[in-house]
């Protein structure tokens, strides 16, 4: 990588404070990964609203047209221990745009957390899902979780492939044959 590219990449994310990482995608583009913050609420709303209907369906296992205030309240409610989220941002037209997010939330069974990852349609297939999930898995381990799981549509091939690559084991949901439960021992 040239010094001009390095300088450009560094300056795009120069004002970021706190824990963060600049990661390379499979096509050479860079994204900023950091914990979700309250200031990201509008970005999260725009991110969800820009997703294709198919991507929204895979993420929420149902039809939603846009992010309601109640949904945003739920998604933004993280405490960095029992619930965590990492956001992927790109510098675009002078603004930071959300292009992906991974999250977990503790479950009623001790030591378990449910996870999800969502990638903007124009950033799918570039390895961003794996980057976000690796950060999420590391934090879940550090926070004492012993198992992570995800409930996904059986038709979501990308999630099935990602989970397999990360070491999750999948099985059909015994309560809903259209869904798969992927589990990872932490």
UniProtKB/Swiss-Prot annotation:
> What is the recorded name of this protein?
Acetyltransferase PA5475
User: What are the recorded GO MF terms, alphabetically?
Assistant: acyltransferase activity, transferring groups other than amino-acyl groups
Q: Which InterPro entries does this UniProt record tie to the protein?
A: Acyl_CoA_acyltransferase (IPR016181), GNAT_dom (IPR000182)
Binding residues for CoA, per the UniProt record? 117-119, 125, 156, 161-163
- Its function? Catalyzes the transfer of an acetyl group from acetyl coenzyme A (AcCoA) to an acceptor substrate and releases both CoA and the acetylated product. It prefers the antibiotic chloramphenicol.
Q: Which organism is it from?
A: Pseudomonas aeruginosa (strain ATCC 15692 / DSM 22644 / CIP 104116 / JCM 14847 / LMG 12228 / 1C / PRS 101 / PAO1)
| Any Pfam family hit | Acetyltransf_1
EC code: 2.3.1.-
On whether Nucleus is a keyword of this UniProt record, the answer is: no
Keyword Plastid (UniProt): no
Protein keywords: Acyltransferase, Transferase
**Where would I find the N-acetyltransferase domain in this sequence?**
31-186
